[in-house]
Amino acid sequence: MFDIGVNLTSSQFRSDREQVVARARQAGVTGLLLTGTSVEESEQACLLAAQYPDYCGSTAGVHPHDASGWNDDTADLIHQLAGREQVLAIGECGLDFNRNFSTPQEQEQAFSAQLAIAAERAMPVFLHCRDAHARFMALLTPWLDKLPAAVLHCFTGSGDELDDSLRAGLMIGITGWVCDERRGLALRALLPRIPDDRLLLETDAPYLLPRDLHPKPASRRNEPCFLPHIVRQVAAWRGQDAEWLGRNVDENARRIFRPGQRGE
């Protein structure tokens, strides 16, 4: 089982990153994709991935919250990062109209620019969409035939949004959000509609600690070592064997991100 979304650059992991990675290995997690959300964090994620070349890859991109800082220099730096062997996808990029830390116009500019970089580099995109589905799809769709893959990270949308995303060919990332008996029930009901070859699983650690995890860590911090819990729960709700599902999502992640195969 491969965790496609780990924010290992978070300050919450500053004191024990090595132990976090070791616990993930011990738990049976077969690889980690470290998320970049700004130029600085993308650089840090790449450097961290280089410390674990057989286990970690990273992404390089600018999150919509940080899109107000996008400029030509940002684009050049993301381009440069995309050339490093540790960087397996462009992102986390997309639209977030929930809080609008950057204006919609700034978000759209940064998103479109990153789609262009991914297309030029023939790299997958690691996508974020919140309360922006229609505009997100309008901007993304013209690029899809130019991209090797598109991964919708931390999907929490509606059934119609899921159907749109699947028709467009997107991979669907599911987090421990689905383990929340309050806000995750609607998503839980959608799980059987995701084809086996389109499903990816992720912790989004240190965020989104599964609410049904027992015992919970005293820190209330999520870690990639809890991915097996998400695998077991998702397998049960999809009516599948957990061991099989773990292998399946690992195969999907390796097919999309091709860790260890950059330049081949």
UniProtKB/Swiss-Prot annotation:
Protein name: 3'-5' ssDNA/RNA exonuclease TatD
Family per similarity comment: Belongs to the metallo-dependent hydrolases superfamily. TatD-type hydrolase family. TatD subfamily.
One cellular component term from this protein's GO annotations in UniProt: cytoplasm
Organism classification: Bacteria, Pseudomonadati, Pseudomonadota, Gammaproteobacteria, Enterobacterales
Record has RNA-binding as a keyword: no
Superkingdom of source: Bacteria
Subcellular location: Cytoplasm
Entry binding sites for a divalent metal cation: 92, 128, 153
Subunit structure, interactors included: Monomer.
Originating species: Dickeya dadantii (strain 3937)
Keywords: Cytoplasm, Exonuclease, Hydrolase, Magnesium, Metal-binding, Nuclease
EC number(s) stated in the UniProt entry for this protein: 3.1.11.-, 3.1.13.-
